[in-house]
Amino acid sequence: MSENVVSTGAVNAVKEVWEKRIKKLNEDLKREKEFQQKLVRIWEERVCLTKLREKVTKEDGRVILKIEKEEWKTLPSSLLKLNQLQEWQLHRIGLLKIPEFIGRFQNLIVLDLSRNTITEIPRGIGLLTRLQELILSYNRIKTVPMELSYCASLEKLELAVNRDISDLPQELSNLLKLTHLDLSMNLFTTIPPAVLNMPALEWLDMGSNRLEQLPDTIERMQNLHTLWLQRNEITCLPETISSMKNLSTLVLSNNKLQDIPVCMEKMTNLRFVNFRDNPLKLEVTLPPSENIEEEEERELFGLQFMHTYIQESRRAGNQVNCSTTSPNSIDADG
């Protein structure tokens, strides 16, 4: 009996030794595998970094990363070694997201990631206090973070053809240097209050949205000289539009306007307007030009058309003043 006990104890001891050895061997193999994977990652990052370095150019004194029509769904962290970059131009590379570490590129002046498949803007974008141009057109972005308002140097913002953006955070009115804003081909139903309160805005494109009317507070955009509103559903214009003294270009083609209001006569700085493809009530024929060249260059639904329409409207006793937006319209506060 005692011999059996001794024999069993010896077997258990040997078993325990072997189990420890096997466990240690497995741990060693795991560490070895992890080490090899780490080496592979380091090697891949070095290869990526080498490829990225080859894409860096210098133009007009700026250090630019320029990639187009290559497959870069994500950007490696090794890119951080190129933190001297001042401009990114990454087009048609299938990029799925802006890297979270974007905020560490403190020297960035231009970030152009148009024509990719980006779905969101990281909050870290707000750390780019030197950024002057942000181009994110032709992506799949649905919302804009309020942190973008921290980009105090931003002068140009393009979010065209994302198709699903319907509003902007109010905080974007703090972009005191923003002069150029492109929101065309999205889902806006009104001009956001943030836009109406951007003090330096000079150029705005909200074409191909779902605008039905313009807010009375549109007059706040006193520095605006160019306004694109083509391909919307606008039915009337507010009287306050005539107070936009610096407006020189106004495009209203492909809307639902039935009349051109008399108040637009006051807009003496207008140099170009377009009322083409609106269901206007009056049919207006422009007087013939003195020569063929003038006839060819004349805009059929432009400035002369507008003034002629207003005159015809007066003769017909069909004067239409600029409308005030209806009580249920969305006004811009603050």
UniProtKB/Swiss-Prot annotation:
Keywords: Coiled coil, Cytoplasm, Leucine-rich repeat, Muscle protein, Repeat. LRR repeats lie at residues 84-105, 107-128, 130-151, 153-176, 177-198, 200-221, 223-244, 246-267, 269-290. Signal peptide: none annotated. Residues 10-47 form a coiled coil. It is found in: Cytoplasm, Myofibril, Sarcomere, M line. Interacts with MYH7 (via C-terminus). This is Leucine-rich repeat-containing protein 39. The lineage of its organism: Eukaryota, Metazoa, Chordata, Craniata, Vertebrata.
